[in-house]
């Protein structure tokens, strides 16, 4: 994909998030659907950040770096720490002692094995706040303003 397509996708995702937040503030009936929309766009941004981390979004490393920051910012994720975490995952892929993603899964295994139907909606909305914080422990986040505001709004 060309530099422009990745940048355009990032801009569109940011605009969808901003529009959804704005419309939800004026029309409360849109809050629940808005959670799904914002969740899907945050997931899309994380994919853009991941691809930029591998320098796949552009042949220019500086553009990839900026795309990482713009993609990871609403997630509260530091691109530098994400790269460290993610590249360790690639280096130790599947190793139960060294792969950070495997270690994370083992840490929350009890919670997943006792998964209830009522948690499905929370998973779809991304509202498992304590698990999100656990993941952030591994990737060393800097809480962004957008992330903090969204999480506080969800917890109220």
Locations of regions flagged by a protein language model:
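Acidic (Asp/Glu-rich) catalytic motifs at the cytosolic membrane interface
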Residues: 42-61, 82-94
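Conserved donor-binding loop and adjoining core beta-sheet/short helix segment
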Residues: 27-45, 49, 64, 68
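Post-HEXXH active-site segment of zinc metalloproteases
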Residues: 58-73, 102-103
């Amino acid at each position: 994909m060309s530099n422009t397509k990745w940048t355009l996708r990032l801009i569109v995702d940011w605009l969808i998030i901003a529009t959804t937040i704005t419309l939800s503030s004026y029309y409360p009936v849109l809050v629940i659907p808005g959670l799904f929309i914002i969740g899907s766009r945050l997931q899309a941004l994380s994919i853009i950040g991941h691809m930029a981390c591998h320098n796949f979004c552009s042949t220019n490393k500086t553009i990839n770096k900026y795309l990482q920051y713009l993609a990871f910012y609403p997630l509260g994720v530091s691109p530098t720490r994400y790269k460290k975490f993610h590249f360790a995952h690639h280096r130790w892929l599947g190793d139960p002692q060294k792969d950070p993603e495997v270690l994370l899964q083992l840490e929350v295994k009890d919670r997943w094995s006792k998964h209830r139907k009522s948690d499905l909606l929370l998973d779809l909305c991304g509202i498992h706040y304590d698990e999100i914080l656990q993941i952030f422990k591994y990737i060393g986040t800097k809480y962004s303003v957008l992330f903090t505001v969204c999480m506080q709004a969800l917890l109220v």
